[in-house]
Design a protein with these regions (language model features):
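Phosphate/adenylate-binding glycine loop and adjacent helical scaffold
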Residues: 91-94, 98-129, 142-143
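N-terminal cleavable signal peptides for secretion/export
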Residues: 13-64
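Actinobacteria-biased recognition of intrinsically disordered, low-complexity terminal regions
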Residues: 1-17, 288-290
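Acidic/His-leaning functional-site neighborhoods
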Residues: 189-237, 246
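Surface-exposed beta-loop interaction hotspot
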Residues: 120-185
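Short strand-coil-strand connectors
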Residues: 61-63, 90, 113-115, 194-198, ...
Length: 290
């Protein structure tokens, strides 16, 4: 869900634009490049969880080999393959059984199935593991046209205050692929700000020092992506920060159905329209990609 953020150099500033507007344009250009990378959001073609009995082998759609859970407390999956399968893990051809370390390990394994297909192993909060399959020549990448976004709006940059929890802040969180189920999570705190003439108090996610704001507003499902949008926030030592909704970005599930994104909780559903930031993912013909 976390997106890499680059800063613009002076040479990237565009004639006639303010420095903040040029930085937003540079960020949007970087985003458009990132989502079509070999393991960018548009490249994800499968996420398959491997659960059940330890060493109970399972095939995974689209790639060779058999994949098995490891004992509880071990990071990753057990892969069984022959040399003819052509699977490379950390640069070595697999011929037999090998542990493929997850992204939660100190040194995650690098998996290559072909010139375009690669893999990573991810962990859930319950310590289950899944293989993610990435295709650098996916249909999504081939059909991608642009990330549609609102024009830059200086009024969408507002001062805010972060208030850490005095004790706990338990919030029910639902996920896109698990509707009807919720998880109770203790969140780090709230941010308070004024936008559209109204004061708002929203909860944030993460482990700090950078937090993630997951929100919906009056544009959600109308002129912006139906699930909601994300915004990275980073308060200073006093809890003060600037919220720039021009940098609001689409969650990974807007690009691939194989991501499972959190849905904005009721506390984070704004009645006002936030007409700033990314809107939707477009195909080459300007239709919605999904």
């Amino acid at each position: 869900m976390t997106q890499h953020r680059d800063t613009a150099t002076a040479s990237e500033l565009i004639d006639g634009e303010s420095a903040p507007e040029a930085l937003v344009d540079a960020e949007r250009s970087q985003r458009s490049r990132a989502v079509i990378a070999g393991q960018g959001n548009l490249a994800l073609v499968n996420t398959q969880w491997i659960t059940g009995e330890v060493e109970a082998s399972q095939p995974i759609w689209g790639v060779p080999g058999l994949w098995s859970p490891l004992p509880l407390g071990s990071s990753g999956l057990l892969l069984s393959a022959s040399a003819s399968d052509g699977i490379f893990v950390d640069g070595e051809l697999v011929d037999g059984a090998i542990v493929v370390a997850g992204m939660d390990a100190v040194s995650p394994s690098r998996i290559r199935f072909s010139e375009t297909l690669t893999g990573t192993v991810i962990a859930s909060e319950e310590d289950d593991y899944a293989l993610r399959v990435w295709d650098a020549d996916s249909e999504g990448i081939r059909d991608f046209g642009a990330i549609d976004a609102f024009p830059y709006d200086p009024a969408a940059v507002v001062e805010a205050t972060f208030t850490p929890n005095a004790g706990t802040c338990d919030v029910s969180i639902a996920y896109l692929k698990e509707q009807g189920k919720t998880q109770e999570k203790t969140l780090p705190g709230e941010i308070t700000f004024t936008l559209g003439g109204e004061e708002h108090r929203l909860v944030v996610y993460g482990d700090g020092p950078n937090w993630l704001l997951i929100f919906a507003d009056a544009t959600t499902g109308d002129t912006t992506y139906s699930v909601g949008r994300f915004l990275s926030v980073a308060p200073d030592a006093t809890g003060s920060l600037m919220l720039d909704f021009n940098l609001a970005y689409l969650p990974p599930c807007a690009f691939s159905y194989n991501f499972n994104c959190p849905i904005p909780p009721k506390q984070n559903r704004l009645a006002i329209a936030v007409t700033a930031g990314e809107r939707n993912v477009l195909a080459r013909n300007d239709d919605l990609l999904h």
